[in-house]
Amino acid sequence: MILNWKLLGILVLCLHTRGISGSEDHPSHPPAEDREEAGSPTLPQGPPVPGDPWPGAPPLFEDPPPPHPSPPWRDLPETGVWPPEPPRTDPPQPPRPDDPWPAGPQPPENPWPPAPEVDHRPQEEPDLDPPREEYR
């Protein structure tokens, strides 16, 4: 409880020394920072007007840089050379009828030995639910 009274006393002391009150009887002294910047532009008084820019705000778009004497996109070769010819590529050849693997890289050789023969006959399934003996 003592702590609350101390905080209240500090708050009242701060409010009294800063001159903050509910009435306009005492004009407050401007802080030292405001007195130094007397030449700075004043802030707008009242609510902002829709559409008006905020004072001192930077422009939305910067001005484009000045044009250079020869921009890189204008350094094109002579008109007879443009557009350049694409590199020549041979068209793909149709597969030959006797070619088992027509185009592209050849398949790798199978490194695995052949699998053993598997008996595919149906096996008798074990009875998972054997009959129970009746206890008397």
Curated annotation (Swiss-Prot):
Residues 20-136 are annotated as: Disordered. Residues 1-22 form the signal peptide. Residues 44-74, 83-116 have a biased composition (Pro residues). GO terms for cellular component: extracellular region. It holds the Pfam family SPR1. The keyword DNA damage does not apply. Residues 23-33, 117-136 have a biased composition (Basic and acidic residues). The keyword Secreted applies. It is found in: Secreted. Keywords: Secreted, Signal. InterPro entries: SPR1. This is Psoriasis susceptibility 1 candidate gene 2 protein homolog.
